[in-house]
């Protein structure tokens, strides 16, 4: 199992820290990629081989934890999400940023 931190790919501005976006938009975007909570209002979103852990009641969302439970399936989903939503993923054990393929 691998654990990553999900961060915005943009830098903070003078108006405050960069965010991943409004919670509702994140839920909508991830739902379109087969990743969603088990019940409305849930803070853990489940997808193929992955789960996102959101901080309770955080809006806008600054960062999330991403747990990769099935590496064979999960990496394809992570690459699609990262490219589509322009997020970056950092390994919490090494501090290395995940480099997504450019296909």
Which ranges hold each PLM region?
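Acidic (Asp/Glu-rich) sequence patches and key acidic residues
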Residues: 1-103
């Amino acid at each position: 199992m691998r654990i990553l931190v999900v961060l915005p790919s943009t830098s903070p501005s003078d108006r405050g820290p960069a965010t991943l976006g409004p919670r509702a938009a994140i839920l909508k975007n991830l739902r379109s990629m087969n990743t969603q909570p088990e019940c409305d209002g849930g803070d853990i979103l489940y997808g193929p081989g992955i789960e996102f852990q959101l901080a309770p009641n955080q809006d806008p969302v600054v960062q999330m934890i991403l747990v990769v439970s099935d590496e064979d399936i999960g990496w394809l989903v992570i690459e699609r999400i990262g490219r589509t939503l322009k997020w970056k993923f950092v390994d919490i054990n090494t501090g290395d940023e995940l480099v997504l393929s450019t296909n």
